[in-house]
A protein has these predicted regions:
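Conserved alpha/beta-domain cores
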Residues: 1-237
C-alpha cells in the first residue's frame, strides 16, 4: 500500500480470515519490517547491513505506533476467533516483556477475546535461552529461514554462499532439539514455519524431536498430513 494501514483497514483484513477460521486459533505476526522487508514509508535511514540492523523487535520498540495500531486491530479480531500473536526477531526475554507490555497497554479497556503471546525463535540468542523464553510466553514459533541464516552467518540471498544455507546440518538440528526440549519442560507448544516447512521430507524428523506443528502452503497440506500420519504410526508401532 506504500503506507501503514489504519486500524480499521488492518481489522478488515484480519476479520476476513478470522471468519473462515470458525473458532480456531489465528496466528498473526506483529509487523516484521526492516531487513529484507523494508518499508519505505517508515523513513528508516539506509543501513549497510539491514539484516543485522533496525528490524523486527528492535524496529517495533522504536516505532511504538506500529504496535499500538496493530494491537488494537488484533484485539478486535480476537472477538471473532482466538488469536495467537507472534513477536518477531526477539533476541532476549526483556524485548518480549517490553513489547508484550506495549501490546497490553494498547488494548487496555477494549473488549477482546482470547489472545495468546508467543516468541519467534529465529535469533540464536533466543534459542539458547529457549527455556526461559517459554516460561514467560504462551507458545513458540521457529522461523527456520532466518534461524539458518543467523546460525551459520550466511546470506540466504547470496549465490556465492548458497550451499551453506541448508537445514541439513547437525548444529541446526541440535538447536531445534534444544527448543523442543524446552517446549516439553515448560508445557508450551512450539511450531515451525518457513521454507523448511514446505519440504515434507523433514516432517518425520521434526516429529521425532518434538516439533508437532508445521506451517505449510495450502497445496501440500494433504501430503504433509499423510507424511505426519505415517511417521506417527511408525512411532506408535
Amino acid at each position: 500500500a506504500g503506507r501503514l494501514l489504519s486500524e480499521d483497514e488492518q481489522f478488515d483484513c484480519y476479520a476476513a480470515v478470522a471468519e473462515a477460521f470458525k473458532g480456531r486459533p489465528l496466528n498473526i505476526r506483529l509487523a516484521d519490517m526492516g531487513g529484507d522487508k523494508a518499508a519505505q514509508f517508515l523513513s528508516i535511514p539506509r543501513e549497510d547491513n539491514p539484516v543485522l540492523g533496525y528490524r523486527g523487535a528492535r524496529l517495533l520498540l522504536g516505532q511504538p505506533d506500529l504496535v499500538l495500531c496493530q494491537a488494537r486491530a488484533i484485539a478486535r479480531t480476537s472477538t471473532i476467533t482466538p488469536v495467537q500473536v507472534i513477536y518477531p526477531m526477539i533476541a532476549d526475554a526483556q524485548q518480549f516483556y517490553t513489547l508484550r507490555g506495549m501490546f497490553r497497554q494498547a488494548i487496555e479497556g477494549m473488549d477482546h477475546g482470547e489472545i495468546r503471546h508467543g516468541v519467534m525463535f529465529e535469533v540464536p540468542s533466543a534459542c539458547v535461552c529457549a527455556r526461559e523464553m517459554l516460561k514467560v510466553a504462551d507458545f513458540g514459533s521457529i522461523g527456520s529461514n532466518d534461524l539458518i541464516q543467523y546460525l551459520f552467518a550466511v546470506d540466504r540471498d547470496n549465490d556465492l554462499v548458497a550451499g551453506d544455507y541448508t537445514p541439513d546440518k547437525a548444529a541446526f538440528w541440535r538447536v531445534l532439539g534444544m527448543i523442543a526440549e524446552a517446549s516439553k519442560e515448560t508445557g508450551k507448544p512450539v511450531s515451525l514455519c518457513g521454507e523448511m516447512g514446505g519440504q515434507t521430507e523433514y516432517i518425520p524428523k521434526l516429529l521425532e524431536i518434538g516439533v508437532n506443528s508445521v506451517s505449510v502452503s495450502p497445496r501440500i497440506i494433504s501430503l504433509a498430513r499423510l507424511t505426519a500420519k505415517s511417521r506417527l504410526s511408525a512411532i506408535g508401532s
